[in-house]
């Protein structure tokens, strides 16, 4: 009987000790002075809950990805960087289109002669068109074309010089304005006019020489002897 009584007493002591330890742990936990093992257990529950929430958030993102749409063509992109590059390309295209329209309007407002020669060429040839082709007797013209002397032509060369001057004046009146001519054509026609002037001058010199020679021959034929 005694050993059994002693065993029962020891069991009661163990139970009491266990109850006391449990009460002590609860009091320490309520005061915030729990042991490290208890704290680690609590933290493990917290980390597991946070990991599950993060995993759920990732699954939601994969299930419903964010989409960015273009403001110009309504094209959809899955990143803001790709959308920004696409919209910058749209802006460059619109800038080039506006610049092309501006140049087109500017060119259409210019006169037709400006397309062939440019602004400087038009003003230069327009000023040249206002200059006289023939200067006065005493002064040279601005274009460098000298006027011929106004000496009297011989009678037998009158028709030739008159016809040449008529042809020369007709060619001048038939030419278009210098402002609408090409520079190469203008120089060629000025050279042709100079050649015709040189021919007329040569004919004048030949006629003057022939008239002097005929006068000299007639002077020789005169009989200067006195007849009584």
UniProtKB/Swiss-Prot annotation:
Relate the induction remark in this record: Induced by white light in dark-grown seedlings.
Q: What is this protein called?
A: Zinc finger protein 1
GO BP terms, alphabetized: abscisic acid-activated signaling pathway; negative regulation of abscisic acid-activated signaling pathway; photomorphogenesis
Under InterPro entries, the record lists: ZFP3-like, Znf_C2H2_sf, Znf_C2H2_type
Question: Which GO molecular function entries does the Swiss-Prot or TrEMBL record give?
Answer: DNA-binding transcription factor activity; zinc ion binding
- In which broad location class does this protein mainly occur, judging by the first location in its UniProt entry? nucleus
Taxonomy, top ranks, is: Eukaryota, Viridiplantae, Streptophyta, Embryophyta, Tracheophyta
Other remarks on this protein? Seeds over-expressing ZFP1 are insensitive to inhibition of germination by abscisic acid (ABA).
The subcellular localization recorded is: Nucleus
Q: Which Gene3D superfamilies match?
A: Classic Zinc Finger (3.30.160.60)
């Amino acid at each position: 009987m005694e050993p059994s009584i002693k065993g029962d007493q020891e069991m009661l002591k163990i139970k009491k000790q266990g109850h006391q330890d449990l009460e002590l742990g609860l009091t320490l936990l309520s005061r915030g002075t729990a042991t490290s093992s208890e704290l680690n257990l609590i933290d493990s529950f917290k980390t597991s809950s946070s990991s599950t929430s993060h995993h759920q958030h990732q699954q939601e993102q994969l299930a419903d990805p964010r989409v960015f749409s273009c403001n110009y063509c309504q094209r959809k992109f899955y990143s803001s960087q790709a959308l920004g590059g696409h919209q910058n390309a749209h802006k460059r295209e619109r800038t080039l289109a506006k610049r092309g329209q501006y140049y087109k309007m500017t060119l259409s407002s210019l006169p037709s002669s400006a397309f062939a020669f440019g602004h400087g060429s038009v003003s230069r040839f327009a000023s040249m068109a206002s200059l006289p082709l023939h200067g006065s007797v005493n002064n040279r013209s601005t274009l460098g074309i000298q006027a011929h002397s106004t000496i009297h032509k011989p009678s037998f060369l009158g028709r030739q010089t008159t016809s040449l001057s008529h042809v020369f004046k007709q060619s001048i009146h038939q030419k278009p304005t210098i402002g609408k001519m090409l520079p190469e054509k203008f120089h060629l026609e000025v050279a042709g006019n100079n050649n015709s002037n040189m021919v007329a001058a040569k004919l004048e010199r030949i006629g003057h020489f022939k008239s002097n020679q005929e006068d000299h021959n007639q002077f020789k034929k005169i009989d200067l002897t006195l007849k009584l």
